Amino acid sequence: SNAYRTTGVDANIVNMTYKEVKTLDAGSWFSDEYVGENVPSLKEVLELTQGKIKLNIELKPADNGTALAKNTVRLIEKYNMVNDCVITSFSESVLKAVKTYNQEIKVGYILSAAYGDFYDMKNVDFFSVNAAFLSKRTIDAIHNSGKRVYAWTVNNKESIKNLTNKGVDGIITDNPVLARETIYSRDTSETIVNMIRYVFNQ
């Protein structure tokens, strides 16, 4: 994962030390109010959010997939957030490793495209699929396999309504305020309100 989008530094996190990462300014891109805000560690995020919100933690392994899965699971367990976190990844092997360490943690496989019989994958609780590839047929096939499906990344009102009408179980967005306003607006059906749960059942 590259740090440029949120810090302005064109460097891959995997090639940086923890100390180097902590010197990055991760707040300026968002708002002048947050200039100088450091990149938080997962430990810091869990400490801050424990008992307050639920988290979708995406793992992006380099050559350390098993260790990354183990350390992430141990931190989640330490803060008693097994039921408050899901783990997602493009790496099936990392998700399998997560399940090896704790079967109770829900894991989701991220897909850039939806082709073939991917929905029959074992050790996966749900799929996070590029919204451009989510037809009603694909959504139904995933549901028929007993799994849930979430659409990414959806940042406009019409797409949110369209996908929820097709039956997705949740929306992944960069604009949660817009998503919430769309879901609970007067012109949004009760069916959509009931279906959308931002990855977790609320």
Protein language model features and the residues they cover:
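Metal-dependent phosphodiesterase/phospholipase catalytic core, i.e.
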Residues: 1-106, 129, 143-145, 199-201
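C-terminal active-site rim and adjoining tail of enzyme catalytic domains
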Residues: 32-36, 108-202
